[in-house]
């Protein structure tokens, strides 16, 4: 069973999220959902903080459906959420895949991330996000600041961990996945994909197939 955690401004009905789900159905059952504040889901996005509760609920539901083995596959924001979920909920998942995730919070080193920070932190940006991207963002700052992805990674072991990142990612350069891999040490695996951009849009069917095979091989 795969539980797919989409990226920021994604949603269960977005074509790129549906494509990911279809590709993974070749390897097992798939649960998809929309994070809070995204698409038709209620509430407001906290951009990776309380979304860990949403993923936990989806994983619990997958278990209640009778699936004994569950792997989480997260993209960008969803990738950071998958890392924190695995660190905070002991034995919640049997394998974790994080694709295009940041290693640290508040990164503004690329133009796309500076635009994203404008969407999140400015009232006019949140209006654009609501009506342009169907994503409603909470106006409050994080308090407390959640565990960062790189801090979460060492707490995931012994659950198998796969970190996937494109070397042409326009949001987070390759020092992010390398930081995550270093934090995982020999408990994680890094795939640095040549020519790949960011998150679901950039994940080829071939890559999704390899991810599906990896999860099946590790989670059983």
PLM regions and their residue ranges:
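The serine-hydrolase catalytic nucleophile loop
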Residues: 8-21
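Conserved alpha/beta-hydrolase "acid-adjacent" motif
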Residues: 170-176
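Conserved alpha/beta-hydrolase
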Residues: 21-42
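Short beta-strand/loop motif that positions the catalytic acidic residue
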Residues: 156-157, 163-165
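Catalytic histidine-centered segment of alpha/beta-hydrolase-like enzymes
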Residues: 196-206
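Gly/Ala-rich beta-loop-alpha elbow adjacent to hydrolase catalytic centers
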Residues: 74-78, 82
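Hydrolase active-site cap/lid region
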Residues: 90-141
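Alpha/beta-hydrolase active-site loop
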Residues: 46-65
């Amino acid at each position: 069973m795969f539980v797919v955690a989409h990226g920021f401004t994604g949603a269960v009905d977005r074509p790129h999220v549906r494509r990911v789900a279809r590709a993974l159905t070749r390897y097992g059952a798939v649960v998809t959902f929309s994070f809070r504040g995204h698409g038709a889901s209620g509430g407001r996005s906290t951009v990776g903080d309380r979304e860990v509760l949403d993923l936990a609920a989806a994983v619990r539901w997958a278990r209640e459906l009778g699936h004994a083995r569950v792997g989480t596959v997260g993209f960008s924001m969803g990738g950071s959420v998958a890392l924190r979920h695995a660190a905070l909920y002991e034995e919640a998942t049997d394998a974790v895949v994080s694709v295009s995730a940041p290693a640290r919070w508040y990164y503004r080193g690329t133009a796309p991330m500076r635009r994203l920070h404008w969407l999140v932190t400015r009232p006019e940006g949140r209006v654009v996000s609501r009506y342009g991207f169907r994503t409603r963002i909470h106006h409050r700052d994080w308090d407390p600041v959640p565990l960062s992805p790189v801090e979460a990674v060492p707490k995931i072991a012994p659950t198998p961990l796969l970190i996937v990142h494109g070397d042409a990612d326009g949001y987070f350069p390759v020092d992010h996945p390398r930081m995550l891999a270093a934090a995982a040490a020999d408990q994680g695996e890094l795939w640095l994909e040549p020519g790949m951009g960011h998150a679901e849009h950039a994940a080829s069917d071939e890559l999704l197939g390899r991810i599906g095979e990896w999860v099946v091989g590790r989670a059983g």
